[in-house]
Amino acid sequence: MRAVSDFLKNKWVAVPAVALLILSLGFLAQNYITGSFVSGDQIEYTSNSEFFDGEVFVINYIGDRTTDKIHAEIPASELASAADGEVTKELTIDITSQETYARYSTTSTSLSRIYAFKAINSEVFTDTSSSEVESRKQSWAEQNCYDIDGDSEIEQGDDYTQRFWVDGAIADYYNAQVYCVRENGYYGNIAELSSPDKEFEAEVEVKADGETPQSTTLSNSDLGQGRCDNIGEYVRACWTGLNPTGEGVPEPYNVYAIHSNTFSPEWRVISAERYSSYNSYVENNLYSQIEAWKEGSLSQEEVVSTANDQAAQAAQRVSSGSFTDYQVEDSSYENGQIRLNPSYDIAWPEFTFYVDGADYISVEKPVGEPRIVNVEGDEFGEKQSGTVTAEVENTASYEGSFSARVSKCSDSFGYDSLQETKTVGPGETVSFDFRVSFTSDSFDQKTVSGSCEIVVSDTGDSSNSDTAVVDVEATQSNECTPNEEFVRTINSTHSRILECSSDGLTTTEVDVCGDGEEAAFRDSSWTCVSDGTLPGGGDGSGGSGGGGDTDDCVVFAVGDLEIEDPFCADGPLEMLSKMFHLVAGTAVAFFTGSLGYRAGRWVDGEYQIKGGFDPLKSRSVSRAKRGRFLIGLIAELVSFLLGFYVILLVPIWAQLMVILGYVLFKYYTPF
């Protein structure tokens, strides 16, 4: 009692528990055993039960199979050891009796009934003719005699016999004396027995100290294998199967069943051997005894007595063999049921008992007491992640297993819902860190404030928990390129021209294109134009330089590099600009080609040779004078392309000013 008192002073928390007792019970009917204990290694403590809430005891028990009665005591110390807690009540399981038996069903057959007989005779005569007396004799026999050979025909020599004579002083009289037996009632219809079903009954009582015993009668004939039934309010039992004992179940090979309303009960198990003897007597001996009666060697009473003795023997209840101790459980002709109780156990039943520990077994288990003593939030940007932290202290005097998680966050803030579990000693503090994120569809730059909820509980008792709210802040990211215009489509039908603010976070609507209009890039800005003004039906999304305005002018593109058709232009002014580009490209090509020619001769040590770059010069000219033709040709081609497409970047007004300046410098002479 002192240990229990100290335990309660330490504020252990009562935990709802369920005792799950798995008992394999199989016994032979001899003695009554007391004190059959369960060893500690057969007890587990888990939190899985399909019938009751809370933790459960898993207590495995296997009977010693030496009795039909058992008294199993499960000490409180064994339960406490498995639960790692305190249990003050012992649990006892009493099987006050149990028996196993075989059940047989009756099956109708075409076997003949068992009849009682009466010996009869009659004299038939006529003065007409012998054929007439023969006809009258046969008619009488068919109406009164039993079909002994069972061929559905009443025949002389098989089913009846006769004496025939003729007499008369004045006229002839034809006489016939007929001898046979007829039915004088029957004992019943014959049926076969089906193969047996193994069944059991057990009187079970489960009791915890100081509680009302829970008891019932269990039988698989009511439950069915794997099914469960209640034993009172707090106990549930499941039958899980039958283990064979090694003893065979009697098969109904040597017996039949006979049904008659004159029997009590109406079904009776009879000997198959006696039934066969009765049939053999009728088929092989009854006719010869009728002949003996006709000849006078047997009396009429002796024939009847012998035949009816055979029938009575066949209809008697079986008196030897395995089926002497049976019970009729259903007397109806259609659903006859025979129960056989052998003198030995034919199987051992196995049970699983579920005992509600919350109300029936007191279990006290030490758990921790979590308290959140501090929380820390975080500030982070959009599409980034931050960390929230909770510091948790165990304020109990016992070790706790604390599980923490983020249960919810404000809108637009995401979180990882997985929980983290840590073991915390008495008075210790641990930290839990959780990742949070932020995502928004808004264009407005702003700081968004929110919060997340953190929940911590002890895994041994979820009611021991604490909750705290932590603040979080997130900053909206840029949504566009500062000071640039761009186009968005409204409902896939209309273009909307927007201008990005200087901070890249907000936009201003510039224009919305109407029906039949598209957004096109013109003179370094976006504008709405009619569909027909776009070459090739394009959307006018070209760049802002002096090149073409549509993608129709692009003949080659790799990444951001695009090469346009030099003769593709939007208007005469752009065509004039491209003509200047051709002139500039050609000039640059000849200049760089000459430079490449000179460089090639310099490399060959021919820098003192005079002459110009003329790739079409006669082949008789020395190789040294020709220089490196291939190098010069490649340099010329590259220079032309560079000259043409570099000049494309120069606006046309700048090109005109350069040309005008060159002309003035070349041809103008001041006074």
Curated annotation (Swiss-Prot):
Residues 34-574, 650 are extracellular. GO terms for biological process: plasma membrane fusion. One of its GO terms (cellular component) is cell surface. Its main location: other. It is a multi-pass membrane protein. One of its GO terms (molecular function) is metal ion binding. Exhibits fusogenic activity. Mediates cell-cell fusion in mammalian cells (bilateral fusion). Belongs to the HAP2/GCS1 family. Fusexin 1 subfamily. This is Fusexin 1. It comes from Natrinema altunense (strain JCM 12890 / CGMCC 1.3731 / AJ2).
